[in-house]
Amino acid sequence: MYRYKITIEYLGTDLAGWQRQAGVMSVQQILEEAIYKFSGEQVILFGSGRTDAGVHAVGQVAHFDLSKYLEPHKIITAINYFARPYAVGVWNCELAPNNFHARFSATSRYYIYRIINRPCPSVIDLNRAWWISSPLDVPAMQQAAAYLLGKHDFTSFRASSCQSKSPIKTLTELNIIKEDEEIKLYLSAPSFLHHMVRNIVGSLVLVGKNIWQAEQIKDVLEAKDRKAAGPTAPASGLYFVKAAY
């Protein structure tokens, strides 16, 4: 068997997320069907991160096995041809060791969350960022973010449907940068809880609106109660950037 590692980008707006689900179109299904059309083999695609409906990716990593060797550049061309007309594309393909696993071999995952912060919405960024019309206090958000760095029990920022065995995670990066009318939040960790990034963003926005003081984020973290945290930020602003190995 030959194991292939592919890197994928997609717009999640009209998709049901990464994972295959009955009755809806997912990234996994689109790619698995595309691979079958040119290889004749039913494969199972394993992704480095299972993004939700509406979440985008610029560097999602996945792997699959084929019984015969195909040149990686031909695999890229074939997948992109058969994945049409969906907003899903493969931009890299390479052979990987048989013990490589896109999910379990990953040592870190990186996300970006985009906020458009101006009085009028951005037509260009429709469904690609969270539009917030009122000015956000970015320094206060940065101060609050510092409380979340490191190893913590992130139960307060965990979705009720989360299947992770432990709420203990290590947030290695949480940077907030304002560039003109756009605010970007950069987050990285070895792994994340379900909705963890979006729940963190939703809570930091409450700080940015001066509804909460920055210090309240520490109280939310220590509460270990989802009801203590802010709302879940929209999926449209979230991007899976890359996985490190």
Swiss-Prot record:
<comment type="function">
    <text>Formation of pseudouridine at positions 38, 39 and 40 in the anticodon stem and loop of transfer RNAs.</text>
</comment>
<dbReference type="InterPro" id="IPR020094">
    <property type="entry name" value="TruA/RsuA/RluB/E/F_N"/>
</dbReference>
<keyword id="KW-0819">tRNA processing</keyword>
<dbReference type="InterPro" id="IPR001406">
    <property type="entry name" value="PsdUridine_synth_TruA"/>
</dbReference>
<dbReference type="GO" id="GO:0003723">
    <property type="term" value="F:RNA binding"/>
</dbReference>
<dbReference type="GO" id="GO:0031119">
    <property type="term" value="P:tRNA pseudouridine synthesis"/>
</dbReference>
<comment type="subunit">
    <text>Homodimer.</text>
</comment>
<feature type="binding site">
    <location>
        <position position="111"/>
    </location>
    <ligand>
        <name>substrate</name>
    </ligand>
</feature>
<protein>
    <recommendedName>
        <fullName>tRNA pseudouridine synthase A</fullName>
        <ecNumber>5.4.99.12</ecNumber>
    </recommendedName>
</protein>
<comment type="similarity">
    <text>Belongs to the tRNA pseudouridine synthase TruA family.</text>
</comment>
<dbReference type="InterPro" id="IPR020103">
    <property type="entry name" value="PsdUridine_synth_cat_dom_sf"/>
</dbReference>
<dbReference type="InterPro" id="IPR020097">
    <property type="entry name" value="PsdUridine_synth_TruA_a/b_dom"/>
</dbReference>
<dbReference type="InterPro" id="IPR020095">
    <property type="entry name" value="PsdUridine_synth_TruA_C"/>
</dbReference>
<keyword id="KW-0413">Isomerase</keyword>
<dbReference type="Pfam" id="PF01416">
    <property type="entry name" value="PseudoU_synth_1"/>
</dbReference>
<dbReference type="GO" id="GO:0160147">
    <property type="term" value="F:tRNA pseudouridine(38-40) synthase activity"/>
</dbReference>
<feature type="active site" description="Nucleophile">
    <location>
        <position position="52"/>
    </location>
</feature>
